[in-house]
Amino acid sequence: MRRTWLRSAALRRGTVCVGPRARFLRASRAMSMDGELQKHYALLLGIGSPWEVKTVALKLAAKEVEIELGWQWGAAAQCPECGGPCSIHDRAPERTWRHLDTMQFTTLIRARIPRSQCPEHGVKTMAVPWAAPQGRFTLLFERFAVDVLLASGSVSQGCELMGIGWETAQEIMRRAVERGLERRQLEGLKHLGMDEKSFKRGQSYITLLTDLDQSRVLDVVEERTVAASEQLWATLTAGQKQAVTAVAVDMWAPFIQTIEQQVPGADIVHDKFHVSKYLGEAVDKVRRQEHKELMAQGDETLKGSRQLWLYNPQHFSAEQAAEFSALKDLHLKVARAWAAKELFSKFWAYQSEGWARRFFKDWFGWVSRSRLKPVIEVARMLKRHLDNLLTYLKHHITNAVTEGLNSKIQSLKAAARGFRSFRNYRVRILFFCGKLNLYPL
């Protein structure tokens, strides 16, 4: 009796050898558990015939789960080109795909994909249900990565959360943008915007084409030349360009020339924010010239007043408002320049083209007699483009949407600490600002 009890205790501790029958039972239980684990991962992956989970290996040291998938030989094969039935030629070398993590363990899928022998298309690597052709990630991982990158404050933060490198993230975004551009519908475009954005140091620019109604970037090209502008418009079909009714743009000659050639039926609308910028720069030139003259006489009246002349008085503090009011009463040249700028803002409120023309004529006459050269130069430029200023009264569009997207693009550039490659810059802009359908099917 005591011998039986000791043997049972030893068996529980695993300190004695067991017989063939016990070893067989243990192996059977292990095989049963492996089978259940394989079924479990097959369900998680959505894998079914003719594919099956062959093995699941847990690598604790590497913190990885490795899943091997296999093709059930004898199953019907299809050509990836035409979808027709065909025979199996051979198997391609083993490939690995990154999948969603399992309990914080990196999960990898391994498989040798069969290659089909099609009478029409020859030998082709067959498509797999868990990943796109030539992809290095499963469809589920790519979808997750897109969500994380869009939600993260920066790409580097998204990379850290997913445990991937910058180049991997860039590749995921590139593939997502390619998918999005292929699916994008551009019918019904009406109001577009064109604007420039600095790319690198010096005179290096990119040109953006934006859909003002949908607040999205349609495409980006390098430089701001006529050729670059034509390249942008070439992304639209003749029918899409014909539907465009107006384009908001500044007074950059290559942009105007290209719009007139590519979309002759659309009105050019010179953006009121750019006009305000030109007038603001003229006011600042007058201030700097007058400040220099006053300082030569020992007068520091305009010292430290730059922001007061450029910013909206509605946002002034009580102290700033009092200081600005006192400066305006001193009959300074810069005060007259500022008054000309503020007066022109009334132009945009007119509903009648005739009354707007009359206002501009009066404003232009007053400015011409002001003897303020920087303001006069801007007034003459506005007169040359008056017809395209008046189109605002018809369409009421501005490049405010484009400017808002420019701010977002600037934040992308700052987060990346600049871009050496325009290709990567374009992918990043379209990924975050293109409103594309980025997800894999």
Can you say where each PLM-predicted feature lies in the sequence?
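Short, positively charged, Gly/Tyr-enriched micro-motifs
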Residues: 2, 14, 21-31, 83-86, ...
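Acidic/histidine-rich catalytic cores and adjacent linkers
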Residues: 17, 23-33, 76, 81, ...
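Long C-terminal interaction/binding lobes of large macromolecular proteins
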Residues: 29-66, 71-74, 140, 161-246, ...
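Short metal-coordination and nucleic-acid-contact micro-motifs, chiefly zinc-binding Cys/His arrays
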Residues: 72-76, 111-114
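Short, polar/flexible loop-turn hinges at active-site or ligand-entry regions and domain interfaces
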Residues: 128-132, 242, 266, 290-295
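Short alpha-helix plus adjacent loop in nuclease-associated cores
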Residues: 275-296
